[in-house]
Amino acid sequence: MLDKKVEKTFAEWMPINVRFLATYPDFLSMGIIIFFTVLLSTGMKSSKNFNNICTSLNLITMLTAVVACLTKVDINNWKISVNDIDETHRKHAGNGGFLPFGMAGVIAATPNCFFGYTGFESSSNASEEAKNPKRDIPIAIMISLLITLMSYFTISTVITLVWPYYLQDEHAAFPHVFEELGWTGVKWVITVGSTCALSTTMFGSMYTMPRVIYAMANDGLIFKSLSKVNSVTKTPLIATICSGAVAGVITTFIDLAQLVDFSTIESLLSYTIVPVSVLVLRYKATDDIKLEVSAEESIIPKSNIIQKLFNLNNQTASTKETSHIANCAILLYVLTAFFFTWILVHGVSVLPEVMYYICLSSTIIGLLLLIIIMLRQPESNATLHFKVPCSPFIPCASVTCNIYLMMQLNLFTWIGFVSWLVIGSLVYFAYGMRHSEENLDK
């Protein structure tokens, strides 16, 4: 927006020559983080009003861009032949046509695009503020996803119809297109509106984090002081300040592309845990059923293992035994899904052809068997207001797709991801496990 003057100035004055860090300390990003931290600390009402204003401006900007682009739509931009592209751009233009880089290119780019959808789950963290969370939260999530999907679908459609895909500017797509069209006024409207769009995205992320910290601290998983709610603002003030401080430091010194990858893999992990949790709760033992089992009966004869795994007796009530079988199947499914997706992404280049197909077919058979085992186990009879349909198929498909997208990310992202998991595990085993109220109750 400022012709990269800020970037050039800081890169010249304070260059950082470390591979995985930013090329310069981004103090502008830190200032924006501080602003949002202060805003969130003042209370929900002022934060909500600011977010509503930015969201409204964002929608107006999007509509302006779409309407302006509709006047220049050319369907031939989806039919460009690679032979019609000049030599300077041909080597980066793929094969031309509607899918110039094929489905492989679409799948490879999906994890980066996935970042645009993060934030819709923030509605679930507002359950304490909702009037009827059992009804409102699921509806809010579905509406948010639908609006986000339609928004991205619309803008990606019009921008590729207006300007050839190989001439797009990946850093500022709409401003670049309008500048090339000579519409300077529209360009600046879109630029300002895009800033509001970034504000809503940042607000969603920074709103969620303090409440996650609050929930963990309230249970005792992390320090109890982080669960204190300010009597004036009615917000978890300490958690908000701490999360803002950490976010500010990270955004100042970590490269933007790497931050996007970290955010993507963290989101994908969260979205993997959710369907796994759905499956665990679906097969949870029914509380009002208590079975007296002797020591002899607790030893399962080998002849009965298949019978119990596939519930050949057609048992309808979930017990601790059936729940244990289901949980083992869920765990094995997740591990097998990791191996299956690794084979899909990296197997062709690492394994011999025969071994590749043997491993691929074996994991597919294993995944199907585990789904059948889960399907045959009796479900919990707990009454729920919102229940995922077609279980275990939809949760298992979600787990597999999320892990597949995680496998598309680079090695350094995985190293950073594993490092964060190790740090989190150390905090949990050293402090959280001993102080968790949920764990103490059990």
Residue spans of the language-model regions?
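Membrane-interface loop-to-helix entry segments
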Residues: 24-86, 118, 141-144, 260-274, ...
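Alpha-helical transmembrane segments of multipass membrane proteins
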Residues: 37-41, 66, 156-158, 195, ...
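Membrane-helix boundary/coupling elements in multi-pass transport proteins
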Residues: 112-131, 187-224, 251, 257-278, ...
